[in-house]
Amino acid sequence: MKFFKYVLALHLILFSTFAQAQEKEKQMTREERADKVYEELFAAKRSGSPTDPEFMEILQRLIFGEVFYVGELSPQDRELITVVSLTTMQTLPQLKAHINAALNVGNTPLQVRESIYLAAPFIGFPRTLNAVGVFNEVIKERGINLPLENMATITEENRFEKGLALQKELYGDEVKQAMQALPEPYQTEVSDMLTKFCFSDFYTRNGLTLQQKELLSLVILTTLGAEKQIPAHIIGNLKAGNDKNRQLAAMVQAIPYIGLPNALATINLIKETKIENYKPIYE
């Protein structure tokens, strides 16, 4: 009985401390919030720009003092969202800073690497390799040996089978059915290529949860402005455990990096798309 009373008291203390911290954050100014988040991300005090101080202040207060406080996302997930956005856009100097930030807030090197790898089916190998090069540079600067641990879970023999199982779980056989109108060999090669390249080679890998992979894929497609594919991935996110609040939070997190138009387009689609009214994108 004493033990349970002790545990209950401990929980009450922790809850009270957490509530006090939340209340304190609510009372902070945007500048104070920006200072706090910036130091957590970059392990340095926030500083201005000697050439464009006003612009830098707008940027920092919006991203670190405002956007970071919208929605229920962990700092780890926020930085992975930023990493895949910057990878997709090939903004490599900023990518390097945010790879460091992603590691500083508690992501493992493997989680960051796998987030970058995940972009390959969407943006192609050349741009992904550019981002991998930046990642490896950061890892070397931190004194971590390369290569990192292998995360593959498939063999050549079960590659297609494993990828197809994941694809069907989230998306059914929509693409396969849509490609039936193509002449051979394309009616099978195109749909099989999608299965093997995206789901077999990358979705089956360890390092990230399926829930994380789906959310990051939605961010990548939004960054690309691939509106046709986005409704299917909204449904995929719902099936993977990312409710609409989580998807909306990811879009808000991406706004300062990818801009308002693409993010707002996906936000509108999240609002409208439901499992019961979803229509296949390829018909």
Regions found by a protein language model. Name each.
Residues 1-6:
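Positively charged n-region of N-terminal signal peptides that target proteins for export
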Residues 17-21:
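Sec/Tat signal peptide C-region and signal peptidase I cleavage site
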Residues 22-76, 128-210, 232, 239, ...:
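Acidic, glycine/proline-rich low-complexity segments that act as flexible tails and inter-domain linkers
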Residues 74-75, 90-113, 117, 126-140, ...:
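Extended intrinsically disordered, low-complexity coil regions enriched in Ser, Thr, Gly, Ala
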Residues 77-86, 115-116, 212-221, 250-254:
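Short, structured motif recognition centered on aromatic/hydrophobic residues
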Residues 206, 219-224, 237:
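Short, glycine/charged-rich beta-strand-loop motifs at protein surfaces that mediate ligand recognition
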